[in-house]
Amino acid sequence: MAITIGINGFGRIGRLVLRIALQRSDIKVVAVNDPFIAPEYAAYMFKYDSTHGRYKGEVTSKDDSLVIDGQSIKVFGEKDPASIPWGKAGVDYVIESTGVFTTTEGAQKHIDGGAKKVIITAPSSDAPMFVVGVNEQKYTPDLKIVSNASCTTNCLAPLAKVINDKFGIEEGLMTTVHSITATQKTVDGPSHKDWRGGRTASGNIIPSSTGAAKAVGKVIPELNGKLTGMSLRVPTVDVSVVDLTVRLKKSATYEEISEAIKAASNGELKGILGYTEDAVVSTDFLGSDYSSIFDQKAGILLSPTFVKLISWYDNEFGYSTRVVDLLEHVAKASN
């Protein structure tokens, strides 16, 4: 029996989640909700993507539906999640990808509208967070609302897990060099909470805050309080990179650290954590479905207990793939 899902918010993540879900035989997307996008425009936005390219199948709209490769997907335009008729549409699982309803209270409205469970595609202040490959096995069926954490946490956590399991992490600092996102400005404009964030995205390197490193402590409790970090927003459209600098409990050579990561990438974290020794740059990872790809040639070691590790991630496509993976895990655990 197919997992029936609805997507709330047809932005960058919502549209990519739909692309990925359409490739999975066990998932059926039956509805999309976005108050700002009519069906005809939704078809256009889904078909053409400046970053990931044109959708290779057939995309049209008919009345109040999106039609993709002959499959009809209902399009709603409700602002209040509680007003979306998920139940009537036959939706069991909602992907909450607006970036607005990130608390259990906000996500609960989807359940009030007839859905059974909700996966939030952003960090949440109170919903339990899961990172596939790290702690998804701790999911229990009684949890109706969960968070897939952030794209950066999904990159950092698998890497941190391997290092902590093998060598122990005393403490660490993370910097993510992060591509432009939709909340940034095309030209200088008002941004009252974050003044720097109001500056032109395409012409600046912009320091910003991120809770991604601290969030690792929520998915790996042993690292709680041991990691923090910051972000540098840079003028690239997609693909970001994590710089993790840690003090180890156990002495190691850079080769030993690399071997541990390589072993994990071929073992328990296969398909989640990648490994490369090639002379790569950011665009080489466009469309990558890994959460994190360790760049063996880019890291450095100062002493046997002090090391800098570099890992790439497609912050759109890799993350959206994990959203769908978590959905499948939740559905399987719930049946």
Curated annotation (Swiss-Prot):
<dbReference type="Pfam" id="PF02800">
    <property type="entry name" value="Gp_dh_C"/>
</dbReference>
<feature type="active site" description="Nucleophile">
    <location>
        <position position="151"/>
    </location>
</feature>
<comment type="subunit">
    <text>Homotetramer.</text>
</comment>
<dbReference type="InterPro" id="IPR020829">
    <property type="entry name" value="GlycerAld_3-P_DH_cat"/>
</dbReference>
<protein>
    <recommendedName>
        <fullName>Glyceraldehyde-3-phosphate dehydrogenase</fullName>
        <ecNumber>1.2.1.12</ecNumber>
    </recommendedName>
</protein>
<feature type="binding site">
    <location>
        <position position="315"/>
    </location>
    <ligand>
        <name>NAD(+)</name>
    </ligand>
</feature>
<comment type="similarity">
    <text>Belongs to the glyceraldehyde-3-phosphate dehydrogenase family.</text>
</comment>
<feature type="binding site">
    <location>
        <position position="181"/>
    </location>
    <ligand>
        <name>D-glyceraldehyde 3-phosphate</name>
    </ligand>
</feature>
<dbReference type="GO" id="GO:0005829">
    <property type="term" value="C:cytosol"/>
</dbReference>
<feature type="binding site">
    <location>
        <position position="34"/>
    </location>
    <ligand>
        <name>NAD(+)</name>
    </ligand>
</feature>
<dbReference type="InterPro" id="IPR036291">
    <property type="entry name" value="NAD(P)-bd_dom_sf"/>
</dbReference>
<keyword id="KW-0520">NAD</keyword>
<dbReference type="GO" id="GO:0050661">
    <property type="term" value="F:NADP binding"/>
</dbReference>
<dbReference type="InterPro" id="IPR020828">
    <property type="entry name" value="GlycerAld_3-P_DH_NAD(P)-bd"/>
</dbReference>
<dbReference type="Pfam" id="PF00044">
    <property type="entry name" value="Gp_dh_N"/>
</dbReference>
<dbReference type="GO" id="GO:0006096">
    <property type="term" value="P:glycolytic process"/>
</dbReference>
<keyword id="KW-0963">Cytoplasm</keyword>
<feature type="site" description="Activates thiol group during catalysis">
    <location>
        <position position="178"/>
    </location>
</feature>
<dbReference type="GO" id="GO:0006006">
    <property type="term" value="P:glucose metabolic process"/>
</dbReference>
<dbReference type="InterPro" id="IPR020830">
    <property type="entry name" value="GlycerAld_3-P_DH_AS"/>
</dbReference>
<feature type="binding site">
    <location>
        <position position="79"/>
    </location>
    <ligand>
        <name>NAD(+)</name>
    </ligand>
</feature>
<feature type="binding site">
    <location>
        <position position="233"/>
    </location>
    <ligand>
        <name>D-glyceraldehyde 3-phosphate</name>
    </ligand>
</feature>
<feature type="binding site">
    <location>
        <begin position="12"/>
        <end position="13"/>
    </location>
    <ligand>
        <name>NAD(+)</name>
    </ligand>
</feature>
<comment type="pathway">
    <text>Carbohydrate degradation; glycolysis; pyruvate from D-glyceraldehyde 3-phosphate: step 1/5.</text>
</comment>
<dbReference type="GO" id="GO:0051287">
    <property type="term" value="F:NAD binding"/>
</dbReference>
<dbReference type="InterPro" id="IPR006424">
    <property type="entry name" value="Glyceraldehyde-3-P_DH_1"/>
</dbReference>
<feature type="binding site">
    <location>
        <begin position="210"/>
        <end position="211"/>
    </location>
    <ligand>
        <name>D-glyceraldehyde 3-phosphate</name>
    </ligand>
</feature>
<dbReference type="InterPro" id="IPR020831">
    <property type="entry name" value="GlycerAld/Erythrose_P_DH"/>
</dbReference>
<dbReference type="GO" id="GO:0004365">
    <property type="term" value="F:glyceraldehyde-3-phosphate dehydrogenase (NAD+) (phosphorylating) activity"/>
</dbReference>
<keyword id="KW-0324">Glycolysis</keyword>
<keyword id="KW-0560">Oxidoreductase</keyword>
<feature type="binding site">
    <location>
        <begin position="150"/>
        <end position="152"/>
    </location>
    <ligand>
        <name>D-glyceraldehyde 3-phosphate</name>
    </ligand>
</feature>
